[in-house]
Amino acid sequence: MSRPKKIGAEAALARLPTWAKAEGGRDAICKTFRFKDFNAAFGFMTRVAIRADQLDHHPEWFNVYNRVEVTLATHDADGVTELDMTLAGFMDEISGN
């Protein structure tokens, strides 16, 4: 598999208006998803995990009860790539947020 090409957080955010640039100067995008309850949040994470494995691209995330905080960047490219955009779009699509 070829190394993904870095596009940068700013370019990604132009196409993902509900996401934000990660803090700390890192080239990454982030978003907090909120759900009805823990079961809904965990169901979201399960669906994302399956898609992430298919893409061989995995999110950084943190879950407490109904909240899932996600940060996306491609470690091999040291920044945001089309893989991050694909996974972010999938998350938006299935989240209902």
Swiss-Prot record:
The family database entries (SUPFAM superfamilies) matched by this protein are listed as: PCD-like
What keywords appear on the UniProt entry? Lyase
**An individual GO BP term:** tetrahydrobiopterin biosynthetic process
Source organism, top-level taxon: Bacteria
> Which molecular-function annotations from GO does this UniProt entry contain?
4-alpha-hydroxytetrahydrobiopterin dehydratase activity
The EC number on file is 4.2.1.96
- UniProt keyword Lyase present: yes
Question: Which InterPro entries does the entry link to?
Answer: PCD_sf, Pterin_deHydtase
Which Pfam families does the entry link to? Pterin_4a (PF01329)
- State the top-level EC class: lyase
Q: What reaction(s) does this enzyme catalyze? A: (4aS,6R)-4a-hydroxy-L-erythro-5,6,7,8-tetrahydrobiopterin = (6R)-L-erythro-6,7-dihydrobiopterin + H2O
State the similarity comment.
Belongs to the pterin-4-alpha-carbinolamine dehydratase family.
Enumerate the PANTHER family for this protein: PTERIN-4-ALPHA-CARBINOLAMINE DEHYDRATASE
Name of the protein in its database record: Putative pterin-4-alpha-carbinolamine dehydratase
